[in-house]
Amino acid sequence: QVIAFSVGVFVVPGLTSDLLAQERSISDGVYTAEQAARGNREYTQQCATCHSTNLRGGEMAPGLVGQTFISGWSGETLWTFADYTNATMPQDSPGNLSVQALNDVIAFILSSNDYPAGDAELSLDLESEGDPIIID
């Protein structure tokens, strides 16, 4: 007795490239240099006391550059990082940064980790994740 199996593959032109195009990473230039400069000023005022001026962390807070940042957040979305940061920072008043200030500080953190700037500002919406931007 012979049993036959049939496997069908349907290819929709452009679908694969459309799906791949939706997933971006922080290596794709997801913030502007001007935004990172604003973020530097905001970081200095709101974050440097605990995370240090060089973003390497201290007794009270982890570093935000190098392996500490990369190993802690690799594979997560930038939205997840923003949501966590918004919920827990600044430590003395979590959630008090404006969405613009939070995006600017994240742009500064990305810049400090040598991720490239791009042509459009980072504009994460804390109400919904939107298109995922992967931390790589």
Task: Enumerate the predicted regions with their spans.
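Electron-transfer interface patches adjacent to heme c in soluble/periplasmic c-type cytochromes
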Residues: 65-83, 91-103
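Electrostatic cytochrome c docking/interface patches
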Residues: 19-42, 93
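The canonical Cys-X-X-Cys-His
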Residues: 39, 43-54, 105, 109
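Conserved beta-strand positions that form and line the central face of beta-propeller blades
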Residues: 29-30, 54, 63
